[in-house]
Structures are given as structure tokens and as C-alpha cells.
């Protein structure tokens, strides 16, 4: 396996080291290439992502990302627009995958959380995030700013198909989320895609939520969900809410996936670089380790993916609220997957 590693900034460096420790405990064929991308490089020479970086990254089977950014020194949005979004668009990461599971030992803010285990499939290359907009008469009383949500049949069809496939492999229930009563053009395209592709998956139950209703249900009845599919913006909102109801983002992994496998997909913990605790050895590496499990599953190694997920589940279940040490968690999980 040829793996590109972008450990990034802050605690990204620490949690990525533990994720690699666990990966190498289950696989002895991992060849890693480290990339200096993130706040440190930007502050050093002003670079975010060069064409040479991109071409080199494309030569790998997958990308493991730690965390990017330092809000103390890098202006907001610089690395998102200059590094993360270009990676997703230029590597055609059409599917942003976010499993959301309430692990034993994790504390949900919900009073009666019940069993929470669902996946959000977020469209990753279109919608309001594709940069189709502009400003006229900036700085005047007549200023006009626009952002255009771009939705294509090609883009929507492939993410909807991916979501149906995942639902078929899970509990056979798909919920699509939009705002069709107001966003009639984009919503209509999404609805036609759902209806068309749904005919190929007659065993999958389909329902629909407006985005505002989905935020309510995710807080009041999250166990109703199995697979959620939605657009880029709504998915961005829902996945953060999903992280909150499952006890925070310490156990939240994600994948930015090219479903065609023509480009390397990228896997990362949801959390940020947390510079306030960087270097203290107290960051929870479980989200980064679960990102490795997502990566292995994407690459067809289901057995080792399940092995890692079980080890993380056991790790979470065994916690008693005491402070954790980053390397100790990595050591325990690495030992567990080798047992």
C-alpha cells in the first residue's frame, strides 16, 4: 500500500503517528510518503498546494490527513480555500463520508440518546462550495454578493448511488435531506435522482426530511437514521451536529472519497489542529485511528477495518473518565489488533 501522509499542524502530528502505529500493526506492506502541507509551510513560504504536490499525491493508493491550520497565525479560510478544497475538487472527492456512532463510554449531550449508528453521505464537489459567485459594486450602498449552488445530474447521481449502495449494505434505510419546498430547482434534480436510482434498489426504504426537520430529528430521535444523503452545505451542517450528538468529535472519522478509485481518497479525523493542547500528549487519537479503518474498508481490506473498529470500541468502553495519553491509547489499540 502506497500511503501519502499529511500530518499537518498541532495535534494532527500526534494523532497521525498513532494512526500509523495501528495501521502498521495490521499491515506490513505500508509504504508512506510524508508531505509538508499546512500552516507551517504556508507561514514559511506562502505555499498551500502546488501542482507538483498534487501530481505526487496522485501516485498513492490513499491519503491520511491529520489536521490542518493554526488560527493564531493563519487567517481564517486561507488553508481551506488553498489546500483542503483544492484537494477535494482536483482529486474528485465526490463523496464526503461521515460515520456517526455513539460508542460505549462516550457521553452524548442527549438525555435519552438510545442507540445512534448512522452514516452521512455528503456530496463533496458541487453546491454552494464550488466557488460560483461574485461581488458587484463592493463597498458601496448598492453592493451585491451572490453565491450560486451548482448541481449537476452527474454529480448528484453518483453520490446518491453511493448512498443507496451503503444503505443496502447496512439496515436498508435511506433518508435524503434538502429544502425542496424553497430550493425547487436543485431540490427537483435531487428528487429525480433519488426516484430514478431508487428503482435499482427496491429493498431500500427511502424517506425525505427538510433540512430544518432533520436537525430536529437528529437531536430528538437520532436512532431513526441509517444512511443520510444530502448536498454539500446541508451535509456540512448535519455532520457537525452528528458529531455533537454522538459525544463530540474525538471519535469522529471521515473520508473524502473518489468512488471511481481513479484518484486517491483522503481520510482524516474530523477534529481540528487544537494548537492549545498540541505537544502535551493528551489528544485522543481514536478518530485518526478510525479514519485508518475507513481507509482500509475503502481499499477492500474489510477484515482489518473491522479489527481496528472493534479495538477502538473496546478502548472507548473501558474508559472511566480519567485523562488519556495519546501514545498510550495508540499502544493499547495497536496491541489489541495484534492479539
Curated annotation (Swiss-Prot):
Cofactor: Mg(2+); Mn(2+)
Residues under site feature: Important for catalysis: 129, 179
MF GO annotations: 3-isopropylmalate dehydrogenase activity; magnesium ion binding; NAD binding
Positions that bind substrate: 88, 98, 122, 212
UniProt binding sites for Mg(2+): 212, 236, 240
Positions annotated to bind NAD(+): 272-284
Domain of life: Bacteria
PROSITE patterns the UniProt entry points to: IDH_IMDH
The keyword Metal-binding is annotated on this UniProt entry: yes
A GO CC term attached to the entry: cytoplasm
Reaction(s) this enzyme catalyzes, per UniProt: (2R,3S)-3-isopropylmalate + NAD(+) = 4-methyl-2-oxopentanoate + CO2 + NADH
Record text on cofactor binding: Binds 1 Mg(2+) or Mn(2+) ion per subunit.
Locations listed in the record: Cytoplasm
GO biological process: L-leucine biosynthetic process
Family matches, as Pfam families: Iso_dh
Primary location group: cytoplasm
Pathways involved: Amino-acid biosynthesis; L-leucine biosynthesis; L-leucine from 3-methyl-2-oxobutanoate: step 3/4
Tagged with keyword Cytoplasm: yes
UniProt function note: Catalyzes the oxidation of 3-carboxy-2-hydroxy-4-methylpentanoate (3-isopropylmalate) to 3-carboxy-4-methyl-2-oxopentanoate. The product decarboxylates to 4-methyl-2 oxopentanoate.
Subunit and interaction comment: Homodimer.
PANTHER family in the record: D-MALATE DEHYDROGENASE [DECARBOXYLATING] (PTHR43275:SF1)
Name of this protein: 3-isopropylmalate dehydrogenase
Organism: Corynebacterium urealyticum (strain ATCC 43042 / DSM 7109)
Classification of source organism: Bacteria, Bacillati, Actinomycetota, Actinomycetes, Mycobacteriales
Amino acid at each position: 500500500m502506497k500511503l501519502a501522509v499529511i500530518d499537518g499542524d498541532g495535534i494532527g502530528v500526534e494523532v497521525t503517528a498513532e494512526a500509523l502505529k495501528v495501521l502498521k500493526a495490521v499491515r506490513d506492506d505500508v509504504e508512506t510518503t510524508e508531505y509538508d502541507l499546512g500552516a507551517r509551510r504556508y507561514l514559511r513560504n506562502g505555499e498551500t498546494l502546488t501542482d507538483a504536490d498534487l501530481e505526487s499525491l496522485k501516485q498513492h493508493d490513499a491519503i491520511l490527513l491529520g489536521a490542518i491550520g493554526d488560527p493564531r497565525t493563519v487567517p481564517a479560510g486561507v488553508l481551506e480555500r488553498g489546500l483542503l478544497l483544492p484537494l477535494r475538487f482536483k482529486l474528485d472527492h465526490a463523496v464526503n463520508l461521515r460515520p456517526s456512532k455513539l460508542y460505549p463510554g462516550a457521553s452524548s449531550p442527549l438525555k435519552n440518546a438510545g442507540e445512534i449508528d448512522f452514516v452521512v453521505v455528503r456530496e463533496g464537489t458541487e453546491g454552494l462550495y464550488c466557488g460560483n459567485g461574485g461581488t458587484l459594486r463592493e463597498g458601496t450602498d448598492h453592493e451585491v454578493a451572490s453565491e450560486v449552488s451548482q448541481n449537476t445530474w452527474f454529480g448528484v447521481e453518483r453520490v446518491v448511488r453511493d448512498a443507496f449502495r451503503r444503505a443496502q449494505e447496512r439496515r436498508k434505510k435511506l433518508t435524503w435531506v434538502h429544502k425542496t419546498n424553497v430550493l425547487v430547482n436543485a431540490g427537483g434534480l435531487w428528487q429525480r435522482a433519488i426516484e430514478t436510482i431508487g428503482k435499482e434498489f427496491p429493498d431500500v426504504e427511502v424517506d425525505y426530511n427538510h433540512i430544518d426537520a432533520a436537525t430536529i430529528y437528529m437531536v430528538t430521535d437520532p436512532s431513526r437514521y441509517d444512511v443520510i444523503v444530502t448536498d454539500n452545505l446541508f451535509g456540512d451542517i448535519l455532520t457537525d451536529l452528528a458529531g455533537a450528538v454522538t459525544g463530540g468529535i474525538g471519535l469522529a472519522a471521515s473520508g473524502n472519497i473518489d468512488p471511481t478509485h481513479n484518484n486517491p481518497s483522503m481520510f482524516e479525523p474530523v477534529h481540528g489542529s487544537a494548537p492549545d493542547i498540541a505537544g502535551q500528549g493528551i489528544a485522543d487519537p481514536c478518530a485518526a485511528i478510525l479514519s485508518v479503518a475507513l481507509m482500509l474498508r475503502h481499499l477492500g481490506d474489510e477484515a482489518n477495518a473491522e479489527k481496528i473498529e472493534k479495538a477502538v470500541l473496546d478502548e472507548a468502553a473501558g474508559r472511566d473518565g480519567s485523562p488519556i495519553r495519546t501514545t498510550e491509547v495508540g499502544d493499547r489499540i495497536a496491541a489489541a489488533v495484534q492479539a
